[in-house]
Amino acid sequence: MIETQSMPKPAATVESKSKLFQRITSIDILRALTMVLMIFVNDLWSLKNIPAWLEHVERGVDGIGLADVVFPAFLFIVGLSLPFAIDNRRKKGDSEGQLLMHVLTRTIALLVMGVFLVNGETINAAAMGMPKYLWYPLCCLSFILIWNVYPKTAKRSLVFIAKAVGIITLITLAIFYRGHHDDQITTFAPQWWGILGLIGWAYLASGLITVFSKNNFYIILGGWIFFALLSMVSHAGLLPHNNIISAIPDAIRGGTLAGLAMGGVLTSLIFQYYRKEKNNLGLTAVFLAFSAVLIGLSVITRPYWKLAKLGATPAWLFLCSAFTILAFLAIYWLADVKKKANWFNIIKPAGTDTLLCYLIPYFMYAIVNVTGAHLPEVLLTGGVGLLKSFLFALLCVLITGLLNRAGIKLKL
């Protein structure tokens, strides 16, 4: 039985603190693999004659493809990393107010990036005078200027100018933006917040609970149960319709996305506890049991609301959480227990600078559009096409690593 007091808290000694709160290799590797998969599945649109199970399942259909498990895995990993990040900041001396400000500023950054990227999907090139393939690199370059980790030796005036250029560029793009919806010209708006924006809202909910809970296992467990139940209540149409509830972003109000992130936080606390006890077999047993329960919950809820990413159903929440826990467990044994982390060195930049890696494809697609480059049909078809998309993902990781070495590294 796990007691509240014995759940992972900063240990009593400096030595045990350093062991408990060091960077976990398996989490970085899991994040890197997820990022590579995300780039890979996002490139599948360029291919034809590929297995349907690799792609997103259409809205309203009961089922998921590989592409439908990548985003929830990323949300889960956001939660998985949270206790380590918060504890490390506490070790550095951050107050509760500073921790809350950190969560809020990161949330705002993710929302800003998400909104700018999602507006690119509906841009009206004729009305704005700018094609989509120029909008994206301008936005991404601005993100880099604003959130790059500049060397301490850099002149403050130059850093200020770089950040100011990024901010002014984004403001200008937002002012002059023109999009389209149902044959109507639209202006800059949040829309559905985009992938990064949804991550931002889920991060806000799970981050605030993590900060206030101070690693209390039962508060975190209660938070996860709350969002899991909220997901079911929301899909059952039982949420009250009033201005207050409607004002809450759907990524939180719907329960599912925040539930994925909170599941990661809960898993992280369990992981910290058994790792501190050096009980890998106990950790394995608990993770397998937790995954089995989650799969069971997915099976139970699927007949009511289907298993679907588009709709963020409870069954999708439970099943994808189980998949991510099992993947994390396998990688932990391979990388941290068996010391085979070097097997994943080729994708390491995708785990340590994931945001920059996520932005690289926007530049790559822009280059292809500007140059008019076209690959032969054989490279866009079937198995050969899949290999092309996989190599494209690895190329994005390689570029991320090269940019890191050149001094470009993003941190929110």
What are these regions (language model features)?
Residues 2-412:
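Alpha-helical transmembrane segments and their immediate juxtamembrane cytosolic regions
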